[in-house]
Swiss-Prot record:
This is Superoxide dismutase [Cu-Zn], chloroplastic. It holds the Pfam family Sod_Cu. It comes from Pinus sylvestris. Homotetramer. The lineage of its organism: Eukaryota, Viridiplantae, Streptophyta, Embryophyta, Tracheophyta. Belongs to the Cu-Zn superoxide dismutase family. Its cofactor is Cu cation; Zn(2+).
Length: 141
């Protein structure tokens, strides 16, 4: 079972820092995305598509053309643990494109970052099924 904690923080209008620690993953790369809905009534399937307010195609976190929710891959070691710190400018915690109330999803496969040539590369990165998800909420600091 995949479980863990992901913490998002942002100072003023700066980038958002995402700290990830997940356990129970298969070793290797796993797509990690912010999805549009914080709805887990049907498990992770009801979180919708990648958060994409600019209506662009899927890409890598460093690409100009990408979904705002495209956070790339996290890497699990042989122990199934993935730890990462992601700093991103497209997932603010306030304003019209705030990600609070949306969902983070870890996928079963590696995200090809839109460059794999698969029919799903430009929409999902061909990252496979949804292993685990959580809604971005507010907690005291």
């Amino acid at each position: 079972q995949v479980e863990g904690v992901v913490t998002l923080s942002q100072e003023d209008n700066g980038p958002t820092t995402v700290k990830v620690r997940l356990t129970g993953l298969t070793p290797g790369k796993h797509g990690f995305h912010l999805h549009e809905f914080g709805d887990t009534t049907n498990g992770c399937m009801s979180t919708g598509s990648h958060f994409n307010p600019k209506k662009l195609t899927h890409g890598a976190p460093e690409d100009d053309v990408r979904h705002a929710g495209d956070l790339g891959n996290i890497v699990a070691g042989s122990d199934g643990v993935a730890e990462a710190t992601i700093v991103d400018n497209q997932i603010p915690l306030s304003g019209p494109d705030s990600v609070i109330g949306r969902a983070l999803v870890v996928h079963e496969l590696e995200d090809d970052l839109g460059k794999g040539g698969h029919e799903l590369s430009l929409t999902t990165g061909n990252a496979g099924g949804r292993l685990a998800c959580g809604v971005v909420g507010l907690t005291p600091i």
